[in-house]
Amino acid sequence: MNASDTIAAVATAVAPGQGGIAVVRVSGPAAEATGRSVVHCPGRQVCGSHRVMYGHVIDGEGRRLDEVLLLLMRGPRSFTGEDVVEIHCHGGVVAVQQVLERVLAHPGVRRALPGEFSQRAVLNGRLDLTRAEAVSELVAARSRRAAELAMAGLDGGIQAKITALRERLLDQLTELEARVDFEEDLPPLDGDALLDGLQQVRQALLTLVADGERADALRSGLRVALVGRPNVGKSSLLNRLSRRERAIVTELPGTTRDLLESEIVLEGVPITLLDTAGIRSTDDAVEQLGIARSEEALATADVVLLVLDGHAGWTAEDAALLARIPEHIPRILVANKADLPAGALPQPVDVQLSALEGTGEEDLVQALLERCGAAGTEGVLLALNERQRDLAATAAAALGRSQEVAAQQLPWDFWTIDLREAIRALGEITGEELTEAVLDRVFSRFCIGK
């Protein structure tokens, strides 16, 4: 990446052709000249910073391609810290493509790489690394709770917390290094108090890691497969949970011949429900295809709901289906049709409910969230992503080693080795310790235009 280039991309999340307006963003030294060249603004409009101008995008022969608004933001008062131009055009596929092509045709302008706008914002001091990541997470949020946690990061919550912990460690390092160089001139250092301070930071980091792991489901969501023999009520349960008729519900076994999906949100956790075809032996070619897809869903699910007919009781088919579920995938045994007289269920079940009447639904929701480790996320205030958690765990491990050094009563300079490692890891979270490898890892996951 050459930071002196001028870059351009479509910045809006809505796919071309699906929104009334699209935004083409341009950033870099040639941004203003590009905007003035591509957009013709009639009358006596003043092309000033942070002012909106009206005009038309024109081609090389002077023909109008689209009616647009032009917004100029001169650096450093822009998202990237550079001169930025935004062209607000119509959202049709042709309109967006023509505007972007005209921009890219300007000398010195190239197409932006994934995440390059945000990367420039970090390099120019407009964002720290945690805020840049929060931008991506806010765009990708699939639930209000996920958006809340992303916004907490965008507001600087993670950066402030990590910076405060890092500064405490820097203070401790300063004390230790002073003792290494000038121990005879300074009063004795209270080693127990120092260890207590390091342990407080370590515990705070472990709490952040645990909270981030619990909140992971809010970001990525869960795939939940509903599995069971035909006519046990899987489709009725899908319709009950999704609050809309997604599956045809009849008394005929094998009605669901394909894999049906429904997107829902339970207590802030995005969940994809997969209503599988009843897995059984059949000569029907279409049903066989649905069963094959069901088995694929079974292997890739985060959790499996094995739906039983609580009225008919436990059968050999139920036992065979239970054996098909991979050992590493959590499973919940759900006895449906609790509104009817109960049959024999020698196999202990986790939840009894009636998909028809809705009884037991809350028990199922809680069992699902607990089995996936997603329960209790309402208490999470800051959610570190995987990269941030790895670094926080590295820092916590380094601080744990410092306790071992203390137990061995080694000299102060031995303490500084692990302390420096913890400080480096925390600095990498926020971007205080910034390398090209860190930037590549973070921004390669971004979409073009962010």
Curated annotation (Swiss-Prot):
Superkingdom field: Bacteria
Binding site for (6S)-5-formyl-5,6,7,8-tetrahydrofolate: 25, 86, 126, 450
InterPro entries recorded: G_TrmE, GTP-bd, GTP-bd_TrmE_N, GTPase_MnmE, MnmE_dom2, MnmE_helical, P-loop_NTPase, Small_GTP-bd
Record's subcellular location: Cytoplasm
Binding, K(+): 231, 250, 252, 255
Binding site for GTP: 231-236, 250-256, 275-278, 336-339
Coiled-coil region: none
Annotated PROSITE patterns: G_TRME (PS51709)
Primary location recorded for the protein, binned into one broad class: cytoplasm
Catalytic EC class: hydrolase
EC code(s) of this entry: 3.6.-.-
Similarity comment: Belongs to the TRAFAC class TrmE-Era-EngA-EngB-Septin-like GTPase superfamily. TrmE GTPase family.
Quaternary assembly: Homodimer. Heterotetramer of two MnmE and two MnmG subunits.
Protein name in the entry: tRNA modification GTPase MnmE
Lineage: Bacteria, Bacillati, Cyanobacteriota, Cyanophyceae, Synechococcales
